[in-house]
Amino acid sequence: MKKYVVIIDLHCDPTIPSGAGDIGGGNTYSRSLLQELQKHNINHIYITRKKYPHLEEYISMTPVCDFYRINLGDWGPIDKDVLQNYHLRSKELIIEILSKYKDCSFIFHSSYWQSGMLAYDLAKQYKTFYVHTILSNAKKKEQTGAIEDIVKQRIHEEEKIFAHAKYLICSSLSEINEMQELYAIPPEHLILAGLKVDYHYLYPAYNTRGEVRINTLGNTIAEQIYL
């Protein structure tokens, strides 16, 4: 039986670069995830939201990657705090996509809480498990004074998502602490994942003489080595 990792990531389209329109840093994580799955030849289905009508709804990216954008009928950037209103329609469309994969098994990986709602439901339906990337959590935001109209709903959903995920992927030690202290998640269910650091950030921008290490074209000056 062929196995697939199904990535559910409604609020980040990894094919759109960070800084384009409303696209933020979450896309950097999503793109890294997509690249690593392809790099290691892991069969996967990536599902995000179709933001613009000119974007394809399906792309066969590589022999191991099928990429889908589900059409929720609302073009352009939308506030990520309303994605839960599309839950039932999103679930229907994802089930429709997965029905094309006969005699296959699935493992779900969701990113951010509304996609976690889908992974929770679908994992139960397909009798499998899911892992979840947190990105942020409502209890911490509430502690720091952030105001959200949907905070109670979000906390309720996050408690369910976090408690039932096989693993939670955290971006920092502080996030691991938040999961343990605010959501009572056992440490064995928490994974600390990092992002690749670009080589430009591995060395200081200036040498000991105050000279710029990188020339105006952005290239490292190869004949000089600075510690």
Q: Residue locations for each model-derived region?
A:
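A short beta-strand/loop micro-motif in the catalytic core of glycosyltransferases
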Residues: H109, H164-L173, I191
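A short, charged, and often flexible helix/loop element on the N-terminal side
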Residues: C65-L93
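Membrane-proximal helix-turn-helix segments that form the acceptor-binding/catalytic region
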Residues: I150-L168
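Active-site proximal beta-strand in glycosyltransferases
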Residues: V5-V6, A123-E142
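Short N-terminal targeting/anchoring amphipathic segment
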Residues: I97-S115, A119, T128-V131
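N-terminal subdomain of nucleotide-sugar transferases
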Residues: M1-I59, C65
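Conserved donor-binding/catalytic core segment of Leloir-type glycosyltransferases
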Residues: T208-L227
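Carbohydrate-associated surface elements
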Residues: S174, K196
